[in-house]
Amino acid sequence: MLSADYIVGLTDGEGSFTAYIRPPQAKHGAKNYRVECHYYIKLRDDNVALLKKVKQFFGIGRLSFQRDRRPHHHSCFRYEVTNLEQIARVIIPFFQRYPLQGDKIRDFVLLNKIVRAVLKKKHQTRTGLTEIQRWKAEMHQYADSPNTGNPFVRPRQGKSRAR
């Protein structure tokens, strides 16, 4: 069994917290925007056994295969949790108890805000949706990204890391 610290480190390095905002689908009678929240860890296909252990650790989520045909890229597996209630009940409390140490803590904090807003149905109001869109826009803006308006971003000290 994996440790909580290992899960935190793996998420800091290979994981993501994100949200998607989908417009209403009139053909299905929907009037409101849909907000989808995601937590995932993506690893090369030769590490699928590790992702199975992550799935076992949390007891929720699913594994999926992603084929990549680009030169110099590997196909991968993805462990993902997209069920809002499971994210609220399992993923958020876990990372509150065992905090992330890297830049992704900002994405986690923003996802937590989005999840709470969606559970309260705030995405069904114009002001609530606008607030969620603002939080979504702040996600994935790290100190070495070309972003100037993100209040979470602090300039890095010393040498910047090579990518």
Identify the function of each model-found stretch.
Residues M1-R163:
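Sequence-level preference for short, compositionally simple segments enriched
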